[in-house]
């Protein structure tokens, strides 16, 4: 499944129309509108999302009790093969390993990956970047 998201609902200054026109002209599909955005074709969607502060290692700590679904029901793989706990770590700050160098099951079972998921279950993130993530605050 592929889901594109425009993370600017309510504050797009009209730019969503420009982005939407561009995508419709470059991605073939039926583009059926629904409550979350559009179903472009089977297993291919565009969704709207509320704006938030992206995680930044230099940002202030957002809170000590933080929950997130990172490593609990998803993870990310960057274009260079770096595995990260979520797609918001686009810089690979929390580098769990590399799929071009080791097996993904070994990476996901590593002590660091396990600590991340256990930390979120306890609402006590093991990673500094996660404590500075504005997106995670919506779950906390």
Placement of each model-derived feature along the sequence:
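Radical SAM enzyme [4Fe-4S]-AdoMet core and its adjacent flexible, acidic
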Residues: 1-118, 122, 136
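Cysteine-cluster motifs in flexible loop/terminal segments that predominantly coordinate metals
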Residues: 124-140
């Amino acid at each position: 499944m592929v889901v594109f998201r425009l993370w600017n609902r309510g504050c797009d200054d009209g730019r969503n129309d420009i982005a939407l026109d561009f995508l419709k002209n470059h991605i073939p599909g039926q583009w059926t509108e629904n409550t979350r955005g559009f179903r472009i074709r089977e297993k291919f969607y565009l969704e709207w999302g509320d704006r938030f502060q992206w995680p930044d290692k230099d940002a202030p700590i957002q809170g000590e009790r933080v929950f997130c679904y990172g490593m609990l029901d998803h993870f990310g793989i960057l274009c260079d093969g770096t595995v990260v706990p979520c797609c918001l770590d686009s810089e690979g700050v929390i580098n769990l390993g590399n799929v071009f160098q080791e097996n993904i099951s070994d990476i996901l079972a590593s002590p660091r990956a396990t600590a991340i998921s256990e930390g979120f279950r306890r609402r006590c993130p093991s990673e500094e970047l996660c404590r500075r993530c504005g997106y995670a605050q919506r779950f906390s």
